[in-house]
Structures are given as structure tokens and as C-alpha cells.
Amino acid sequence: MRQPSVLGIVSFKVFPAQMGGQKGVANFYSHLAKKAKLVLAVEKENISTANDYTVLPFLYHHKRGFANLRYIFRLRKLIKQQAIDVICIEHSYMGWLGILLRWLSKKPFIIHSHNIEAHRFRDMHKPLWRVYQWYEGWVHGKADHSFFISQEDLDWAITHYRLSRERCTVITYGADLLHPLDKKERVTSREQLIIENKLDPATRLFLFNGTLDYLPNTDALRIIINELLLRLQAKQFLFRIFICGNRITDQWQKVLRSYPDIIFKGFVDDISLYFKGADCFINPVTLGSGIKTKLIDALAYDQTCISARSGAKGIPQEITGEKLVLVDDYDWQGFADNMFTQSDRTLQSVPAAFYQFFNWDQIVQKALSVIAVMKSRN
């Protein structure tokens, strides 16, 4: 039987993949390309080095989405030339394009959602977020199938957007690592961080990272400074909080660098050093939907993680063992207490069930099963 042929449409910058959301899209398609013929039509600013599938950077960013109408017949021609079976559109922004392409090509389309976008707009206080919520529900209802990043998002969309459960599937973010790290590697990385930053070996090392102009992460910076620092300092122990990430304002850089207990690193080429070397990853995030990719990455590195309950949506606690500690939203005293106690404990490694659940090959196989059914019906 011929492999399914998929056209992915990505209306934002993904390549080179640096941030969690970008890595999620790039890794999904790189694993999909092992089992399917893949062509990506992407936004013009993308620079891809992929050599196992075709990447065509000619689309406008979704902020100028309707300008892509000029490429509608180019896309139809591409679908015909490449014998495309299924169209996969990243995020709901360009879902309307999927409707047009289905009408022109008779090919079904999937919306690959990475969060409930209307919730993100609401949290950002966008004045038209309710308009987008109406559009998001409408376009998911028109799609032949919808992939959601978490069970929570899927259940919410089924209830509020009145979608058919049979046309919805959880396709989550995956981890690159397949098993816990060797303990010696963690010790070596910790020693490196201590030496490079001229710290006392007894210093407990915490880590927070992310795209720092993204509202949930910016709010987490505020929480670290206004809610956690004083509570930690009151416990009178040596600690430092590493903050890594890109797209941060000059004002925020100045603020972070004014606190001696915070070590602001900005964007780092090798975030794995910090995942391996820190004693504890913190996720004081309460805003946003979707899934916190940094939390999955940290757990994959066998890192002890403390998270606000809302920030851990999409990660079943039963597969994380002792390594994921959940604190009720806005209980910052409880959060600081756990930072003090958990960072000094020796815990069992992340269970094998975690690596199975967040294994990219298994995630993509689930998506392929849906694509195969859609292909057979077309």
C-alpha cells in the first residue's frame, strides 16, 4: 500500500526550531516524514535544513493570512502534483484555507491545534478574543478532523465548540529522550554550573526557561520576583534561580539582573546543560492553555519539577512518579516550601511510562492512524 501523502501548512516561523512550540511542530513533521510522504508549505521567513522532506517557504504569516489567497492555485497545483491525500494545517488561524483547498481539491484537512487560541488571546486581553473564539469553534467544526495537544483541550473543545468526539484526537508534544539520564552526567553538569557561575557547591540550583515575551511566561517572571524570592530568602539557605529564554524586553533584563539570587542567562545554545545540572525545575505558570513543553522537556531529563496545577495540564501525574510536584494555583507559600524541601531530596527516576506516553514515534503513529482512515475514505 502506498504511503499517505501529507501537505502541511505552517503560517508562522518554525525553522530553525528554537522555542518549544517550534520544536513541537518541527519534531512532529520530522517523525511523520519517516512514515509518510511529506511536503510543507511554510511562511517565507523559515529556513529549513530538512533533507528527508520538501519544505517550500512562500506563504505569508497568518497575521496577513488572507494575502495567501494569491497562492491558492499554487497550493491546488501542489496538491495535484504531489498526489496529496490529506492537508494538515498548524493552528486554527489558517483553517479557512483548509476549507477552500478541500473545495478545490476534494482533499480532507486536519487542524493541528497546539492550544485553545481564544484562551491565549483572552489572557493577553485582546479586545476581539470572543470573535476569535467564535471563529475557532466554527473552523474546527468545518475540519474533517482536529488534533488537540492535550486531553483537557480536547474535552473543552468538544463541550464548548460542540465537536464530534470521533473527529478529535489528542496528539501531544513529544520528548526527544527515551530514558532517564545517567546520574553521573547530572553530577558533572551540576559541577559545571557551579564552577562557571562561581557558586558555593552547597547552592541549590533552580531553573525556569521559556519564550519570555509570551504572557504566561512573563507572568511567571513576575511571580518569581514578587511572590517567591522573599519567601525563599526567609528560609535562609543558599540558592540561585537560572532564567533562560529569548525574546525578552530590555526592561525585564534590567529587572532580573538587579536580583543577586537570579542568574539571567538569556537564550542559551545548550539548554540541556541546565536541565541536567539544576536541582529542580520550577513552573509557576497559571495562564494559558495547551501544554507546557518546557515541563515535558525537564521531566524527560529526569528533573524534579514543581508546577502550579494549571501549568501541568496535559501531563498525567500517574506517569511522573515523584518527579512532578503539583501546587494549587496561587499558593505561592506552598510553592516556595516545596522548592526548599524537594530540591534537596533524592528521588526515583521518572517512570518508563512517561517516556512511552511522550514518545514521538508513538505520537506520530497515532496521527498516522487517523490520516490512513481519512485517506481510505477519500
Segments (PLM) and residue ranges:
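Active-site proximal beta-strand in glycosyltransferases
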Residues: L7, R102-F121
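Carbohydrate-associated surface elements
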Residues: E152, I171-G174
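A charged, aromatic-enriched C-terminal amphipathic alpha-helix characteristic of glycosyltransferases
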Residues: D344-K375
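Short hydrophobic beta-strand element within catalytic cores of glycosyltransferases
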Residues: K294-D297, T304-R309
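Membrane-proximal helix-turn-helix segments that form the acceptor-binding/catalytic region
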Residues: F73-K77, W103, P127-I149
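N-terminal subdomain of nucleotide-sugar transferases
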Residues: M1-I47, Q82, A234
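Acidic donor-binding loop of glycosyltransferase active sites
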Residues: D144, D261, K276-G290, Y301-Q303
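Conserved catalytic-core segment of nucleotide-activated headgroup transferases in glycan assembly
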Residues: G24-S30, A175-V255, F264, V268-D269
